[in-house]
């Protein structure tokens, strides 16, 4: 409706090699699909570029204004929100996220799972390597990445479930 020229691609076991990353292979064998998807979203954007959307996202306007950035993300109430973000192919930050996953195991030495939410390493890397300031305001980083305030991508109150339709909002996460 808002981006009719965009192609929607589904990624699954038929077009993604589950064994390409040890963390992913372990999460897949444990049937922890969300952690598989966390890696795949970065893998796809690194290799193809594009805009990632969780399946429970509803666009409310075109993403076209965001394409001027090398990559874009949004702040949430606390940290980053990653059910939607976009990137050109082969960006350094996305490569750094993939490297982070390749250095980790999903099954830790004590047998428990590494269920670190993907926004934790993303925020750490953006702050340490790219100069992000966690002030929840619009920022353009030196590499061409833009970080938007929460009202652009994060409209659902985590405690009440209430959705606020900010004028700046691009999509709603249900």
Give the role of each language-model region.
Residues 1-37, 53-174:
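Glycosyltransferase-associated regions of secretory-pathway enzymes
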Residues 39-49:
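Small-residue hinge/turn detector
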């Amino acid at each position: 409706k808002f981006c009719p020229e965009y192609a929607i691609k589904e990624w699954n076991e038929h077009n993604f090699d589950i064994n390409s990353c040890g963390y992913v292979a372990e999460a897949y064998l444990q049937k922890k699909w969300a952690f598989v998807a966390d890696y795949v979203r970065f893998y796809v954007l690194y290799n193809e570029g594009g805009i990632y959307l969780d399946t429970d996202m509803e666009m409310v306007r075109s993403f076209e204004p965001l394409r001027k950035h090398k990559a874009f993300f949004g702040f949430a109430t606390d940290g980053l929100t990653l059910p939607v973000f976009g990137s050109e192919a082969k960006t350094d930050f996305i490569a750094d996220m993939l490297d982070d996953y390749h250095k980790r195991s999903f099954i830790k030495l004590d047998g428990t799972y590494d269920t670190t939410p993907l926004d934790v390493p993303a925020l750490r890397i953006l702050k340490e390597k790219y100069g992000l300031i966690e002030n929840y305001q619009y920022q353009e980083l030196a590499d061409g990445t833009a970080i938007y305030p929460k009202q652009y991508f994060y409209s659902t109150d985590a405690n009440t479930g209430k959705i606020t339709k900010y004028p700046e909002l691009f999509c709603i996460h249900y």
